[in-house]
Amino acid sequence: MTYTSGALTAATQSFNLTHGPAAQLSITTQASGATNGAVFTVQPVVEIQDQDGNRVTTGSQATQNVVVSASSETIAGGTSQAAVGGVATFSGVKLTGTVGTITLTYTITSPTSKTKTQTIALVAGAPTQLIVKTAAATCQSRIACTTQP
């Protein structure tokens, strides 16, 4: 910073600005491509930020775990990731359950609990089995079964 006043010699002062305490999360890469039982095609990346949106890069708050949970379905894989320099990069996360719109919640706990949410569409996976719900019964040659499958 430089200070000036009229005919006086300018004075300068150097200082470093640092981030404040962790106050919010920002999803820099949203999870997408959720097929039932398979890992997301795009894994989420979450940034820990101070109240002004600056990434928290140093101290224990910059390396804390970021946890992802699901609103109603089973979530598995790397659901807890230690941040590195304020960035948590997830891998292997997947959902299993009823297809539909699911809310993912990302959470940190230091200095206080903070969350950020996103929605993701869970779509059906490839068929893996065929189930016969009603078995054919009372079948005779060239005569229709009395109970159809």
Model-derived segments and spans:
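Short, aromatic- and glycine-rich surface loops/edge beta-strands on solvent-exposed regions
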Residues: 1-5, 101-109
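Short S/T/G/P-enriched beta-strand
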Residues: 6-55, 71-73, 109-149
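Short beta-strand/loop motifs in extracellular/secreted proteins, especially
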Residues: 23, 44, 62-66, 102
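Short, acidic Ser/Thr/Gly-rich low-complexity loop/linker segments typical of extracellular
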Residues: 77-88
